[in-house]
Amino acid sequence: ACVGENQQCADWAGPHCCDGYYCTCRYFPKCICRNNN
């Protein structure tokens, strides 16, 4: 399963972002998915 926009994700091991999203840790310590666009 993948997670969508503003959902918590992890760069190293799941959950991973759905297609069209990337994981950012700008909001450390919580990493969230953001739209690629």
Swiss-Prot record:
GO MF terms held by the record: sodium channel regulator activity; toxin activity
Disulfide bonds: 2-18, 9-23, 17-33, 25-31
Cellular compartment(s): Secreted
Primary residence: secreted
Keywords attached to this entry: Amidation, Disulfide bond, Ion channel impairing toxin, Knottin, Neurotoxin, Presynaptic neurotoxin, Secreted, Toxin, Voltage-gated sodium channel impairing toxin
Tissue: Expressed by the venom gland.
PROSITE patterns linked: MU_AGATOXIN (PS60015)
UniProt note: domains: The presence of a 'disulfide through disulfide knot' structurally defines this protein as a knottin.
Family per record: Belongs to the neurotoxin 07 (Beta/delta-agtx) family. 03 (aga-4) subfamily. Aga sub-subfamily.
Function field: Insecticidal neurotoxin that induces an irreversible spastic paralysis when injected into insects. Modifies presynaptic voltage-gated sodium channels (Nav), causing them to open at the normal resting potential of the nerve. This leads to spontaneous release of neurotransmitter and repetitive action potentials in motor neurons.
This protein's name: Mu-agatoxin-Aa1d
Native source species: Agelenopsis aperta (North American funnel-web spider)
